[in-house]
Amino acid sequence: WQHKEVLLTAWDILNMEFLSIKNSNDYRDSKQKSSIGELINLYRGYENAQKDLEYLKDGSLNEVFRTILGMTAEQFQYQNFECFFERFNRNYYILVAAEEFEHRGCLDASAAVNNVFGYSIQDYLSVMLMVYWLCSKCPEPLSAPENIYKKIDTTVFTKENITNFVKHYSCSYSDLRDSSLGKQLLYSKPFIKTDRGSKYIASSLLVVFMLIGNGLYWIVRDYYQKKGTQEFPNKFGLLFEDYIKDLASMYCKQNEWQVIEQGVEKGADFLFDFGNMRLLIEAKSALLKLDVKQQVPNLHSANQFFERNIEESYKQLKRSFEEFSRKGDSPIAKIILLYDEFSNTSIIEHSLFEVFQGDKNCFVMTIRQFEMLLYLHKNDTAKFEVILEKIINCMTSASSKTNIDALYSELNINDNPHLKGEMDYFQK
């Protein structure tokens, strides 16, 4: 026997659980004990035997990068837990706290939470954090006696509320076996209900933690999707545009930005004019599907995302670019602004090579990067001007094109002060 160290990633744990449930059951009385090393060896052997290495053999360069995009999108979640606090703050502000938004009444987050759990959003968040704390003590949160978390009679921390929360975010063995999402179902349903004993076990403390960033958004989305309409994506898109207006009002002068009036053919959403350069913004609120954010991504879903969001955005930006390039001499950057978050927007740009390599004026930017940019515009003018200058150089230089991530990294811009202080609802 040779003892060697093997790599086990956080997403491997979910896959091991999924494969165990998919290919076996827990009805037998006998229990086979194995060491962690033996389990990992069994998993690696099975994974290698089942791995389809042919699915990219005839794939295009775009599909290769879209595969990398899906793989890194899953990995990114485990490498940057701060993003979940930021995501919570952003979602909470857009869905709940920003009372002055023009389209505030489009989506009712309070009704969505009350419909599912029967209590307020604040109570929902409190129960979520309590369940996470219970899971940090024991992977079976419902085994905890009520007196551990219920200290007064008026508290929301009751056995019933804790149980209902865990059950709502649970999946059975049959759910996992039958779902087209496979292992990915555990990101939205991180508790597993066992066949034997009907116990509820946290698949991973990390994916329970991820509910902090995603839970409220998913509750509201699912509430409206059950009505069988496109109400949520359409109306959340309007709220996303309201959020961009809010950012502009917060950090820019009134004459530095405008909402672009739409004609027969839809163009870009916003124009920002900073004097030495202009930014055309087309905002897209759609998220990359869960079946793409994994180590073997669903390329059909990935292709749909690019067709409906990236390619369509580019067409809209081109229409507006033709109009505004005739109105002024300062250079114009076309910005596809995404609500979703990615570890590196360069991968998105390489995933539609024919567009981004053929147009050095077009960039992908996440909402986090945009928040940071406008914050610097008001609070660190010198650094903001350096960013604009580097974007202009990128657009006009004969050398290969760079991307927003690389520009920020070069300037050591990592922190996002916008979602701190008054915008930090997690600490309130």
What is the meaning of each model-derived region?
Residues S285-L337:
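Catalytic cores of nucleic-acid endonucleases
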Residues I260-G263, L337-E341:
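Short His-Asn-centered micro-motif
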Residues W1-L238, D242, D246-M250, Q254-N255, ...:
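Acidic, metal-dependent phosphodiester-chemistry machinery of nucleic-acid enzymes
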Residues S249-D273:
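A short acidic/basic microdomain associated with nuclease active sites
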Residues E265-A268, L287-L290, E341-S346:
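Flexible loop/turn segments at secondary-structure boundaries
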Residues L238, D242, V264, E311-Y314, ...:
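Conserved structured core elements
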Residues A248, F270-F272, M277-S285:
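Conserved catalytic cores of phosphodiester-cleaving nucleases, focusing on short active-site segments
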Residues E261, A283, K293-Q294, I347:
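A generic "cationic amphipathic patch" detector
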